[in-house]
Every structure is written in C-alpha cells, then in structure tokens.
C-alpha cells in the first residue's frame, strides 16, 4: 500500500454524515452531546491535518487560528441535527481563541474579553426545503420519482423473499418496540423498515440502559447488515428506470454541488479555502454506487458510520506561493474517512473507473459533470413534484415543461426546451473540442466561460455537461492511505 504525499493543498471539501443523535424515527432529531463531541473531534483532526502550524498537508493561505467566514463556506439543510453537526465540526476546525488573541482594546484603553471564553461562532447557510439550493445536499428529498421507483423495488422477488425470510428475526424485537409509534403492530417489524429499526435499537443501546441486555452483539450486527443492504439498494436502484437518473438523483445533485464549490475556489484564485456540506447518509450511498466505489472496496456497500466524511482535495504537486494554473497544475483527490475514531485515517480511492487516485482538475471536472444534475430546473423535470410538494418548481414549468416535453417515466425520454438549449449547445461544443484534442481533455488550455441556465449551480468557469452516460464502469483497485 503506497503512501502518497503532496506539497500544498489549496482546497478541500467535506461532507458530514448525520452524527449520533436521537433516532430519526421521531420528528426533528437532535444532536446529542456525544454527537457534538464526535463531530468536533473530526473537525479537530482535519485541523491537525490541514491548518495547524506545519501541517502534513497545508491549505495555502488559510487563517491559522481565527475563523474567517470569507475563507470558509458551510451549508446544511435547515434542520437542527445538520446545522449543529456543521457547527461542531467547524468549532473543532477552529477551536476557542486564547485570551490575548480574542480580546479587543477600545479607544478608552479598556480591554474587552471575547464572550463564551473565546469560542468562535461559524456562519452556516441553512437551506430551507423551499429554496432552490436545498436540492444539492439531498436531491432525493421531496422527489416523488424516488418514491415510485422504491415502490417498484418493493415488488422485486429478491426483495420480497428477503422480507419473508427475515420476518421472524425482526418480530423478536417487538417487546422492545411495541410502545414506539408505528410499531404497535408486530407486522410492521419487518425488513421493509430495516434502517428505522436498526436506528431505534442502535441509538437505544447508546443511551438507554434498559435495552442493553435485550440485544446481543450478534443481533445488532445482523440488524446493521440488513440495514446496509436495504438502504444501499434503495439508494442505488438504478435499473428501476432505464437511465437511472431518478434513483441516482441525490448523487447527481451532490456531484454538481462538489463541482460548484471547487470551481468557486478556482475562479476566485483560492479565496475560498474550505467548504463544508453537512448532510445525511442517503446521498453518500448513492454517490458510492454512482461512482462505482464498491469495486475498489466492498466497505462502500455498507452504511457509513456516524460523523463520516467525504473529502475532495484540490492540490498541486508543485511548490507554489500563488494560486496555481487550473489547466496545468491542479489535481483532485477523493478521500474517505469512516467515522470519528482517531485510528480511522483518510483513505484515497479512484473514481470514474480509473486506476489513478489523483486526476487533473480538468479531467475530474469533465467526468464529474457527466454524472451531475446541475440545475434546479433539471431536477424539477426529473422528479416532477407537484407545486405543493416543491413550490420552487412552479417557476420552471412554463419554460422547462411543455406538453411534448414532459418527463416520460416509461421510456426515459427527455425533450429539449429553449431553457435547456444552452446546455445542449455546450454539449456539442464539448464533444467537438474533446474529439479535436484526441480525447485528451486534460490538455485543454482554455477556461470555459459560460453561464448556466436559471438555477445553475455551476456558474462561470465550468464546461456544461453532456448526456447521461452508461454506468457500466471498471474501476482500479489501488487503495492509498494519505
């Protein structure tokens, strides 16, 4: 197993999974003290790696001690558990300032100490479910197309066989859950609710002494394994629809968000140093499947542990003092850390069916954009929610939907409207340039200057994407710890 290092990391992006809190079975799950500590520990570990004096992988020009909102971007759904998880991470990344640094001196000579013992309060964008930006972190939420697809999955013979074969296993937990809403009837204890049952019992084992002796380690492992399988199948049921756009939607919108944040760093010459997206496990699982990460490691079939992180590092292997040239010097590496335990290291994995764990930025951008849904209008077209389900989509219906341009759930046909013509034109341009370069996209020297349609996440400096390509990939198996 090779050990890889590089000189100046100029950007890194992180996605946090839901931390250990109250069970998601109940409305408005909350972050527990344990969850806050775990996310704070992960933030502290990232600080040691990227920010502290003489770190192993330095983020170029980042503030060492004082949190600067101009350098750090953070976004989360407008839900308590996600916002608090992001806060905990960032307070680990930037711990309380010492008294001297935090104090201020005013004109009369008085020294004013900082409140909260110097704790730094990060700025986090709370994405309301009615905001166009809400789809990027979890594109599956309020997407009725997902519900229809998952209903198809529930009629699959393999799925129904699993429900039948595990029924007696689940029903043994009825004495524990009979007083929990939705489980008053034993019949609801089944594989169909695999994650919810695992979540209730797992959280209970952490916080409730009364059930510790009622669930064996073997039982918990089986509950976890069944939840792994159930949720992975739901997140990656790409064959329920011919081109898989619906079932991969959360991974595709997440891919667009990643492109957008990295591109923001490049177009600003590194002003934005670090971006944090706080979300749940569902887009993670879909991302693993969409980008075929299960081939280099079967661990990606399972649910990520609490406070797991995906990281996309934009870096250069050259010794630099100013922001590098995007076309020639910048590379991307994807790394994953499963959970918050200090012994869990960031591990690099290849993407897009390639063997290399580091790709030129332009190549990464091209590959990633093939598998992204980068406008709210496109999301609305794929998911086709009612105005009540997603009011924001009403603004796209007149320009993006026509009677002949509706999304055909039977054949996966996607018509071309005026609002999408900019995308199609750019696709043709991209195809011509790629062919002219002999397929060597990474050698292109010109930066693309094209503004996307209404609701575009990519903005300027990003080539528009092509059509949805086949998901039959072969990926290298090299795994590198960094």
Model-derived features: where do they sit?
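Signature for phosphate-centric chemistry
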Residues: 2-71, 77-275, 281-482
């Amino acid at each position: 197993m090779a050990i890889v290092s590089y000189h100046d990391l100029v950007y890194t992006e992180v996605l946090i999974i839901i931390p250990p809190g109250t069970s998601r079975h109940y409305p408005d799950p909350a972050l527990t003290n344990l969850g806050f500590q775990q996310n704070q520990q992960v933030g502290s570990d990232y600080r040691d790696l990227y920010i502290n004096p003489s770190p192993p992988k330095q983020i170029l020009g980042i503030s060492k001690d004082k949190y600067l909102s101009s350098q750090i971007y953070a976004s989360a759904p407008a839900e308590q558990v996600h916002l608090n998880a992001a806060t905990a991470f960032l307070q680990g990344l930037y711990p309380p300032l010492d008294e001297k640094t935090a104090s201020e001196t005013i004109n009369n000579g008085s020294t004013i100490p900082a409140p909260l013992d110097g704790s730094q309060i990060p700025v986090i964008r709370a994405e309301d479910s009615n905001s166009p930006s809400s789809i990027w972190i979890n594109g599956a939420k309020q997407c009725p197309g997902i519900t229809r697809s998952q209903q198809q999955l529930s009629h699959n013979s393999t799925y129904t066989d699993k429900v039948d074969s595990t029924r007696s296993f689940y029903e043994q937990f009825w004495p524990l859950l009979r007083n929990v809403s939705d489980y008053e009837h034993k019949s609801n204890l089944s594989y169909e609710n695999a994650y919810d049952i695992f979540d209730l019992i797992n959280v209970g084992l952490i916080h409730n002494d009364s059930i510790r002796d009622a669930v064996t380690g073997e039982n918990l492992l089986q509950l976890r394994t069944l939840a792994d399988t159930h949720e992975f199948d739901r997140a990656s049921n790409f064959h329920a629809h011919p081109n898989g756009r619906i079932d991969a939607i959360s991974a595709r919108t997440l891919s667009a968000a990643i492109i957008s944040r990295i591109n923001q760093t490049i177009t600003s010459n590194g002003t934005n140093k670090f971006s944090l997206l706080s979300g749940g496990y569902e887009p993670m699982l879909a991302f693993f499947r969409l980008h075929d990460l299960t081939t280099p490691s079967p661990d990606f079939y399972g649910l990520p542990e609490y406070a797991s992180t995906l990281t996309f590092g934009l870096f250069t292997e050259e010794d630099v003092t100013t922001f590098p040239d995007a076309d020639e010097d910048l590379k991307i590496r994807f790394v994953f850390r499963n959970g918050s335990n200090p012994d869990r290291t960031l591990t690099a994995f290849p993407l897009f069916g390639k063997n290399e764990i580091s790709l030129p930025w332009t190549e990464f951008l091209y590959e990633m954009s093939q598998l992204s849904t980068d406008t709210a209008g496109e999301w609305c077209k794929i998911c086709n929610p009612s105005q009540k389900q997603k009011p924001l989509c009403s603004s796209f219906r007149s320009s993006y939907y026509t009677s002949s341009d509706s999304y055909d759930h039977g054949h996966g046909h996607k018509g071309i409207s005026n609002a999408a013509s900019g995308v199609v034109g750019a696709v043709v341009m991209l195809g011509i340039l790629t062919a002219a370069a002999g397929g060597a996209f990474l050698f292109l020297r010109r930066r693309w200057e094209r503004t996307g349609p209404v609701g575009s996440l990519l903005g300027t400096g990003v080539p528009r994407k092509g059509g949805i390509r086949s998901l039959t990939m072969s990926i290298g198996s090299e795994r590198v710890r960094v």
